[in-house]
Amino acid sequence: MASTTPITMEDLQKALEAQSRALRAELAAGASQSRRPRPPRQRDSSTSGDDSGRDSGGPRRRRGNRGRGQLRDWSRAPPPPEERQESRSQTPAPKPSRAPPQQPQPPRMQTGRGGSAPRPELGPPTNPFQAAVARGLRPPLHDPDTEAPTEACVTSWLWSEGEGAVFYRVDLHFTNLGTPPLDEDGRWDPALMYNPCGPEPPAHVVRAYNQPAGDVRGVWGKGERTYAEQDFRVGGTRWHRLLRMPVRGLDGDSAPLPPHTTERIETRSARHPWRIRFGAPQAFLAGLLLAAVAVGTARAGLQPRADMAAPPTLPQPPRAHGQHYGHHHHQLPFLGHDGHHGGTLRVGQHHRNASDVLPGHWLQGGWGCYNLSDWHQGTHVCHTKHMDFWCVEHDRPPPATPTPFTTAANSTTAATPATAPAPCHAGLNDSCGGFLSGCGPMRLRHGADTRCGRLICGLSTTAQYPPTRFGCAMRWGLPPWELVVLTARPEDGWTCRGVPAHPGTRCPELVSPMGRATCSPASALWLATANALSLDHALAAFVLLVPWVLIFMVCRRACRRRGAAAALTAVVLQGYNPPAYGEEAFTYLCTAPGCATQTPVPVRLAGVRFESKIVDGGCFAPWDLEATGACICEIPTDVSCEGLGAWVPTAPCARIWNGTQRACTFWAVNAYSSGGYAQLASYFNPGGSYYKQYHPTACEVEPAFGHSDAACWGFPTDTVMSVFALASYVQHPHKTVRVKFHTETRTVWQLSVAGASCNVTTEHPFCNTPHGQLEVQVPPDPGDLVEYIMNYTGNQQSRWGLGSPNCHGPDWASPVCQRHSPDCSRLVGATPERPRLRLVDADDPLLRTAPGPGEVWVTPVIGSQARKCGLHIRAGPYGHATVEMPEWIRAHTTSDPWHPPGPLGLKFKTVRPVALPRALAPPRNVRVTGCYQCGTPALVEGLAPGGGNCHLTLNGEDVGAFPPGKFVTAALLNTPPPYQVSCGGESDRASARVIDPAAQSFTGVVYGTHTTAVSETRQTWAEWAAAHWWQLTLGAICALLLAGLLACCAKCLYYLRGAIAPR
């Protein structure tokens, strides 16, 4: 498509000013001549105000404001200045008039209705209306209520929320601009197309019409015409604008205007009768019926022909049982038949409904009957008190008189019949020695069971306590609505008409000591009105009515023929320039520089940087706790850095000696040993006063009682050994910390999209590429940051603190809240306390812990040669100077402040339909943990392969789509292991650690005897259709209505082809 140079408002203003100056010069020259004004010419009958006699199919004859009488197509742009000058040169000059000269009069302007009006001003045009008049594009007016060529003079609409339902109609011509020119910011200027051909609207409407707005709310199509709808604000007032868009040429040039057609806007239209035939009441009723059918179909619980679920897997009998139960090993229960809650079962000679006999958890499917060959005893599974038991039954002989007894499964009692037709088994005194729990008599369930009670022995497998949950069951969305018990806790005491509720129970209303439960909106509204403190039911009724009110409002507004003129007779599609997106693709991109993905073009993260405003916070030197010392196999005469120069490094000793709050201690080991040096004991008086008289020193002198002198091996026991230690807080010459404050930080993500670079931020998370638009879900900016630039012995590193410091709170002593010096010479913080020196033996348990704040531990170390020993020094934390030390900075800062916790989300809107690449390799290390056929999701985790998103399937069932890398999800398992997983190609086996549904607990009571026969439920499709004939009839009617609605939508889309792809 050929490109056109955008016409800016500045260029248009310069051209209009030049044309205005020429016009003023021409008018001034004409006014200076002495001539008599011509009488006004009469309008021809074809251009009179009565437009009823003209041909509506052909072009209109219009006269310009110059009165030259030539034909001109006012839908085109004005002629160039060369043609205009040539036409002036061919026109003969007017002859001089003999009338006396008169004063110059204001020029008069043709109004298009046979008259003229004085021009308001002679200066340059100041608004688009004056600019259109100056260009000579003022066609004759016409009555907007009569028929008019819709393409020669088109109509746009404006309406404001501040003025109510008042619609302003703006009639104007199109200039020959083709597609509207775009400015540098991607917007188009509607003032370039403002060429009115109807009544001039008020000034505030013209100002709103020419207000620039780049966002387009939607495109409205009507036949071959296209309208663009916009929302914008002018001076605090919100306006809606419906602009007529020009047609676009397929070859890049402006296409010719379509043939002029005439359309009479009436209440009924003969051209489109389908728009009127289907009104708001019919749409509301049809939508109500369809929604009721959808809700009823989803919740009514239509039963299939047969339950095809797999039979339940029973647990194996426990091994820890008594020897007298060994004969039951060969009597394992057979697999029962599958059925559903619509079947019947035989109890004695009577057939009863299964829902009246079996407990609730069996009604959900998976229940059965286990008939064994032995009539009197057998094994089966009992469910009682949320526990599963593997039970062995023994008949009891009938008692002489009816005696009530209490069961282990329930607290209810039942009377045993007085007589029994068959003798009972003599196993009354059998015990459950090998079983753990679950023993007790079983109450009789049915009157047809004439046998006596049974002793139930079982092994407890699991114990769960699910809470009570309810659901609502609706028949076709109409009342009455029933309450369905999903799970029930017996302790809650919910009853239906006095009968305890079990899972699967359906009841209009449940009662318990906690209150009442119902699904009926009328009852809910009544309960909410009666109990003003609880508005849950009223809110539920309100939420139920809101969708229908919205449907009514939408249908009423969409089906009205008049009201919002052209806006309400079309359908909203999408923004201006109909969308060319084929489809949307979504994937993730990791946040490490160099990560790449395919969506569907290659996207790579080139780097991450952040921008901020930097304020220098100065520099400081941290306190440094430094210690030194020496282990000497004799007593020195001069305890100082000079006297101990042979054992102590000179430079550290001098730096520590000149430091702040110095601590210096001298210990003498074995001062009271016997022998030739025993007289030295008197020198070590507490405080060292005697020693200082003979050996002057500045350190504290302490005797080291109980310490070993093994460090100086090879000497007699009367050897005296000394230990010297020196420590203080110093300013290290090569340790500095500079502080910088970063405000208004903004993270910039540098992406490479198909080779093209693109930067996204939280303010602009989009990338426009030739392939489509990329939207990035970027994390929020970190906010204010504090940067610590630490320089330790030439190794410079930066640490970042999140947020601004609270200098009036807990951060008052931190480095960022102190006064710093530019040359890093100031020590930050108060002077720390004097360090504490302590002599610790090598086998002291104290060495297993860390030194306390401001403590220094010294330990003599045995040397490898005689008279050679060393000293091990351990310094603790910095005490009161902790907050100024590098350790505090590392504990309160991070090395990467803009690293997000998760990946970046990429949403790509493609230009043409493409499909994202899908991984075909199987996932790796997939683990499945949980249970199957138990209604609880199991945990599925593993590693997705590269090459695109993995559409994970587990045993043929879709689990979800995951990007390459580790994934964790939950899925319902319907089959037992083994599990095969794949990503659409080859499959692999996953490791599974699951438990079967028999190990899961349910709510209920003992479901009866093993001798109860359950008839298998089978139902043909004909029987099902005969039982549901009314629902099928209603569904067929709804299907016909839905087909009619779809046909109307298809016809509407057919008529909107001009808006979807304007020609």
UniProtKB/Swiss-Prot annotation:
Residues 70-87 have a biased composition (Basic and acidic residues). Residues 556-582 are cytoplasmic. Glycans are attached at N353, N371, N410, N429, N658, N759, N791, T1011, T1012. One of its GO terms (cellular component) is viral envelope. Residues 30-69 are annotated as: Human C1QBP/SF2P32-binding. Disulfide bonds join C153-C197, C590-C595, C619-C824, C641-C653, C699-C712, C758-C767, C807-C817, C931-C934, C950-C983. Structural polyprotein: Specific enzymatic cleavages in vivo yield mature proteins. Two signal peptidase-mediated cleavages within the polyprotein produce the structural proteins capsid, E2, and E1. The E2 signal peptide remains attached to the C-terminus of the capsid protein after cleavage by the signal peptidase. Another signal peptide at E2 C-terminus directs E1 to the ER, with a similar mechanism. Residues 93-107 have a biased composition (Pro residues). Coiled coil: none annotated. Residues 279-300 are annotated as: Functions as E2 signal peptide. The chain crosses the membrane at residues 535-555, 1029-1049. Keywords: Calcium, Capsid protein, Clathrin-mediated endocytosis of virus by host, Disulfide bond, Fusion of virus membrane with host endosomal membrane, Fusion of virus membrane with host membrane, Glycoprotein, Host cytoplasm, Host Golgi apparatus, Host membrane, Host mitochondrion, Host-virus interaction, Lipoprotein, Membrane, Metal-binding, Palmitate, Phosphoprotein, RNA-binding, T=4 icosahedral capsid protein, Transmembrane, Transmembrane helix, Viral attachment to host cell, Viral envelope protein, Viral penetration into host cytoplasm, Virion, Virus endocytosis by host, Virus entry into host cell. This is Structural polyprotein. It comes from Rubella virus (strain TO-336 vaccine) (RUBV).
